[in-house]
Amino acid sequence: MLFERPQDGSSTAIIVHSNYSLFSQDQSEFKELVSSAGFFPVLELRNNRKYPEPKFFLGKGKVDEIKACLKQTKADLVVLEDSLSPSQERNLEQFLKRKIIDRKGLILDIFAKRARTHEGKLQVE
């Protein structure tokens, strides 16, 4: 299941921080990055696993918790602080029925939205 790229300011997001991320030191910076992409954070969760799981990157319990939070908050997407493999992203999207964006995808979305020249837009593609 593939989802369209969300529009500016119209999407609410659940942010998942991670203890083993290279970037986990500054959660507020990542939250600002999410806001810069035009998403409104409605909830922040922390993943405390020491190692990523091959299927979902997150543990099954955390994925179930996110699913319950999505139902409760009606958030449009989930943003993970870490980088996912394509199969992990696909597995999460299929299980959660929501768009999943990792750190790399978030940064590319920001660049894509702010690219002004034709060359800049091509580089983001």
Which residues fall in each region the model found?
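Extended, highly charged alpha-helical segments
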Residues: 106-125
